[in-house]
Amino acid sequence: MNVFELTGLLLTLTALFAWLNRRLIGLPSTVGVMLLALVFSLLALAAVPFGANVAGPAGDLVSAVAFNRTLLDGMLGALLFAGAMQVEAKKLFSERLVVGLLATLGLGLSTIIVGTLTWGVFIALDLGIAPIYAYLFGAIISPTDPVAVLAILRRAGVPKTLEIQFTGESLFNDAIAIVLFVALSEVADPNVAASLEPGYLIQLFSAEALGGIGFGLVVGLAGFVLLRGIDDYKTEVLITLAMVIGGYAMASALHVSGPLAIITAGLLVGHHGRDKAMSEHTRERVDTFWELIDEILNAVLFVLIGLEVLHISFSTHAVIAGLAAIPIILVARFIAVSVPITILRTRRSFTPHAIKILTWGGLRGGISVALALSLPDSDARNLIVNMTYIAVIFSIGVQGLTISRVARLARTDDDAAASEKTT
């Protein structure tokens, strides 16, 4: 199957699942298409003993797509840019301490807690897996992906500050987690680890992260200058596309963080570019274009997550480890959210029940699956892929469908407390 045929088949499946969800089910788009793709995959597997070989061609499709490369080298830049474009930079700046601590300290705490407790699971199940892979799993599963839940949060009436915290954290901790994953992967590789010098990982992390932000500023400023020089929405859309695709490719060639570069460029264009370099007509067209790109790519991404079950070989021990990881991840998320908020409570106020909502709304998604699939073939890789997939399906399927209820309950508690004070 060539690229054109793959793209056509994948878009057709995505459109079909999106139509079925909108027409018959009515779930949030990304959650609905993922669950429909998952049901389709499970039915295809169940039909194999009866002679209906749907799972084979569908599995070939998933293999040919190469989920990790498709996301990390293709879709991720556009998704991050679209997300950054929608963020109100002034409000994000006002939440910089919260977002910064959640995306760094919170991510680090989650990685350590998940890694340590997962190592305990490895020992309890006598899996014989090296401890470094437990911490790799921690880095893989810790970044949040609230794309699927933001629309639900808005519908539930969550305050704007909490939306900004969710969005800002997810954008930056996705990018930072990828850098952390690369660093831990080098430690896990015995051929590389033996030659590593003290301080190398800190140097690598700093070069990737700071280099990515610096390069993103260059791309964003260059894009701003080009956008300000013309007033033609078709050309300006093309410029933003070039910033994403060309900028991401160049960042990879320069060995700096492509995700951080694109986020930085997207924030610059979304704030300064939209206000000072685009006419109102162009702003509407550019916003509509990137909103559409965001919706389409997210739908395709979550369909791929649902279909990925056809390509994963599950084992009993791996499934048990994956199920055990779910409460571990939730506990780690609770601590990773609680510590930064507790530190900052002396300096500012927070939305009531912020810890509860940020904990339960911290969904895991495609980034985690892609990172797990990018590991080199080994028993440890198969285990981590199993665990990651189970955790992601639970996160999107259970947390994604119940976060609005959690938000409403929190709001109801606040209303009840307020009425008691007035009586």
Where are these regions (language model features)?
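Transmembrane helical cores of multi-pass secondary ion antiporters/exchangers
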Residues: M1-T423
